[in-house]
Amino acid sequence: MFIDYYSELFSTSNLNQLEEVLAIISRVVPDSVNVDLVKPFLKQEVDMALKQMTPLKASGPDGMLPIFYQHYWDSIGDNVSCVVLSCLNSGTIPTSLNHTFITLIPKLKNSERVSDFRPISLCYILYKLISKVLVNRMKSLLPYVVSKFQSAFQSDRAISNNIVVAFEMLNHMKIKKDG
């Protein structure tokens, strides 16, 4: 029941016209930003990603927390960075690093339906490091692909701001209609 629900929720279908859609989207990333995006990844990026991790965040399949890596980084940092950089610079992640535990967290106190649960993925720290380095690298790209009027993916805005904007627009339209 859970597998069917989430498989359907997180899958896509009817990708027949994907190429046509992509063909009409203009390129908005300047070459200068693209050069930074495709340059080889560096150890400093891995170091920064680890420092940004919450020390006691949920562990992965191995039970390890970021605090272990942060505390012993002087001893293990070179080896860990070597693995992470190998994955990032080759574009491949070994299957052994890609194992994830999926846990369902109830959204409500008395959850009864499948839709009442939120899945979270518990990944290896190495996988999280790879993801964090990629996210940090792509932050420079966001101003070019996310509209300034959009609330999601904006560090200084909350999606809930849209409610206020919508209310103000409706109020303005009502005033124009009445006045």
Mark where each language-model region is.
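Short helix-capping/linker segments at secondary-structure and domain boundaries
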Residues: 12-17, 132, 136-141, 176
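A short acidic-Thr-Gly-centered motif at the start of a beta-strand
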Residues: 107-110, 165-179
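Beta-strand elements of modular eukaryotic interaction domains
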Residues: 91-93, 111, 142, 172-175
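Conserved pre-motif C helix in the palm subdomain of viral-like polymerases
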Residues: 115-146, 160, 164-170
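Surface-exposed loop/turn segments and immediately adjacent short secondary-structure elements
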Residues: 1-115, 129
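A short alpha-helix capping/helix-loop junction motif
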Residues: 98-99, 143-150
